[in-house]
Amino acid sequence: MSGLPLVQGSYKTSQDQRSLVGRISPALAFYPRIFPIIFRAGAMAKRGRYDDEAWQASSLAVARTLEKAGARLDITGLDHVASLEGPCVFIGNHMSTLETFVLPVILLPFKRITFVVKQSLIDYPVFGHVMRSRDPIAVGRINPREDLKAVMEGGAVRLGKGISLVIFPQTTRVPEFDPKEFNTIGVKLAKRADVPVIPFALKTDAWGNGRLVKDFGRIDPSRTVHFAFGAPLRVSQQGAAEHQEIIRFIVLNLKAWGGVVKE
C-alpha cells in the first residue's frame, strides 16, 4: 500500500502543489474531485470489496486533492506510532470532516484501525457503505451510558483482534478546543483492554464546517493542516493523570499552531 512519504516520522507538503483551478478557487478544485473518490469507495464497499488497501488509497487521494487545492499538510510524531507493537487507542480532538478522510492514510501503514463514530455517519448515503465496511463502533451521542457500553464492549473485541481504535472524546467537531467537553471514554477503554494510548492533536480548519451542510464548508489553504502524535501512555489507576496529559498535549500543540483553546 502506498502512503505519504515520511522523513523521520514526519510529512510536510514539500512545495506549492496547487493546480491552476486551485489558485483561482480552492473549493472548486477540491469538491468536484472528492465526490468521485467517495462514490467509487462507496460502490466498492457496497460490493464487499473495500479493504484496508482500498481505504488507504482513497485517503491518499483525498490528501493529494487537498494539496492540489492549496492546502499544506504538516504531520509529526509518527515515529511513536511506528515503534509501538500491538494495537492501541488513538485519542485526540475533533475539528472538521478532514480528519475522518485523511487519518487512514496516516495510520494504516502502521496499524489496522477503525473509528468510533456517530450513528448518523453510518446512515449516510454512499459514505455510509464505506464506514460500515470498516467495522466501526457507532454511538448515538444521546445516551452516555449506552455509548460507554458500546465503546467498552465493541472496543475490547476489536482491540482483541489487533485493530486499533481512533476516538474523538467530544460531542461534535468544533473549530475550538474545550477541555471541559473532552470526556474520558478513550482512557477507560484503554485501561480495560490493557493497551496503550497514543494522544494526537490536530488542526484541520482548512476544511471548514459548512453553515447549511456541516461536511461541506469553506476550503481555506491559508490554514495549514496539522497532525501531531505523542508518545504512548500506559493507563494507571483510574486514568485521571493520563487524561490530563492527553489534554495538555492537545492544548500545547493547538496553541503552537495558533488554534483556539477555551480556558
Annotate the PLM regions.
Residues M1-P87, V102:
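Membrane-anchoring hydrophobic helices of lipid-metabolizing enzymes
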Residues M95, E99, D147, D178-F182:
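Short, glycine/acidic-rich beta->alpha junctions
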Residues T171:
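Active-site metal-binding loops of divalent metal-dependent hydrolases
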Residues R47-L78, K111-E153:
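Membrane-interfacial amphipathic helices and adjacent loop/beta segments
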Residues A29-M44, L84-N143:
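Catalytic core of membrane glycerolipid acyltransferases/transacylases, capturing the structured
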Residues I106, V130, V157, K188-L189:
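Hydrophobic/aromatic ligand-binding patch that stacks against planar heteroaromatic rings
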Residues G77, F127-G128, S164, P175-A241:
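A cross-family acyltransferase "interaction/gating" segment
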Residues P87-V89, G162-F168:
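Residue-level preference for the first positions of well-ordered beta-strands
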